[in-house]
From Swiss-Prot:
PTM-bearing positions, type Phosphoserine: S171, S200, S201, S213, S256
Swiss-Prot/TrEMBL GO biological process terms: regulation of transcription by RNA polymerase II; RNA polymerase II preinitiation complex assembly; spermine transport
Compositionally skewed regions (Low complexity) per UniProt: 105-116, 328-341
Source organism per UniProt: Cricetulus griseus (Chinese hamster)
Protein name: Transcription initiation factor TFIID subunit 7
Gene Ontology terms for molecular function: RNA polymerase II general transcription initiation factor activity
Top-level taxon: Eukaryota
Function according to Swiss-Prot or TrEMBL: The TFIID basal transcription factor complex plays a major role in the initiation of RNA polymerase II (Pol II)-dependent transcription. TFIID recognizes and binds promoters with or without a TATA box via its subunit TBP, a TATA-box-binding protein, and promotes assembly of the pre-initiation complex (PIC). The TFIID complex consists of TBP and TBP-associated factors (TAFs), including TAF1, TAF2, TAF3, TAF4, TAF5, TAF6, TAF7, TAF8, TAF9, TAF10, TAF11, TAF12 and TAF13. TAF7 forms a promoter DNA binding subcomplex of TFIID, together with TAF1 and TAF2.
Family stated for the protein in its record: Belongs to the TAF7 family.
Subunit structure of this chain's protein: Component of the TFIID basal transcription factor complex, composed of TATA-box-binding protein TBP, and a number of TBP-associated factors (TAFs), including TAF1, TAF2, TAF3, TAF4, TAF5, TAF6, TAF7, TAF8, TAF9, TAF10, TAF11, TAF12 and TAF13. Part of a TFIID-containing RNA polymerase II pre-initiation complex that is composed of TBP and at least GTF2A1, GTF2A2, GTF2E1, GTF2E2, GTF2F1, GTF2H2, GTF2H3, GTF2H4, GTF2H5, GTF2B, TCEA1, ERCC2, ERCC3, TAF1, TAF2, TAF3, TAF4, TAF5, TAF6, TAF7, TAF8, TAF9, TAF10, TAF11, TAF12 and TAF13. Interacts with TAF1; the interaction is direct.
Region described as Disordered: 105-126, 188-212, 321-341
Amino acid sequence: MSKSKDDAPHELESQFILRLPPEYASTVRRAVQSGHVNLKDRLTIELHPDGRHGIVRVDRVPLAAKLVDLPCVMESLKTIDKKTFYKTADICQMLVSTVDGDLYPPVEEPVAPADPKASKKKDKDKEKKFVWNHGITLPLKNVRKRRFRKTAKKKYIESPDVEKEVKRLLSTDAEAVSTRWEIIAEDETKETENQGLDISSPGMSGHRQGHDSLEHDELREIFNDLSSSSEDEEDVNVIDTEEDLERQLQDKLNESDEQHQENEGTNQLVMGIQKQIDNMKGKLQETQDRAKRQEDLIMKVENLALKNRFQAVLDELKQKEDREKEQLSSLQEGLESLLEK
């Protein structure tokens, strides 16, 4: 469906809530429901130039009014047949009328302060006077403080100040004789620290490393003694003995290397099992604590159905505790068998 340029624009409604004292509210309600033609003569609203104060007249009785801001926006709906509703406007303000209010409040003359920050603070305090902390129903009393989060403050820096700071930094860099920069990678430092740490236990690894070094020293001493004593023998015997000694030395070195590799593999396996044991102990302790809390809860509950439900949960925790104990005992047995080897 095409629109022509001659179509008149849609009229937008501007609405607010009118709150009156109970006796005047009932009068206005009856007049609206009866559909009197002279409603405009019975109810008039006059706003002052400041846009926040005004006078509401009900049957020519003046009431002081103040326009306040509601905590949130509400929708206004209209119906003709009480079956289909149409949205007409968004409402965010309410005109509160009182009998004992000041009909003509004093007008504050604007004074230009020297400090702009002081003027902003003054305007903010002035706006707070017209903020309504409650909703339109009784359960929503003080809803602005109970349900709404405070607005986050955004600190803006004016662009001229930023440009001035950038120019100052660039000028100081240009005046510098020399510059020095350094890049530190946290991941690399952590890797180097981890590589520097000894993974195996200090007692076992120190004992095995000392044992291996003693074997290497003994082999070197044997080789040196035999090589020095063989100088007095004949050349043929010297060559044969040297070859035999080299073979023996190589065999022993290979055996020591294999043993060292086996020891390292055993150490890693032991550490892995020990870690699993520690984790299993933590899980077992957590399960036991949960079971203890469940037992205390069952003792306090009097409802039979609820107690049966809690008892079922406790039985599951007990079964889980038994399974974790079995896993822990099997891990400990495996660790003991490795240490005996």
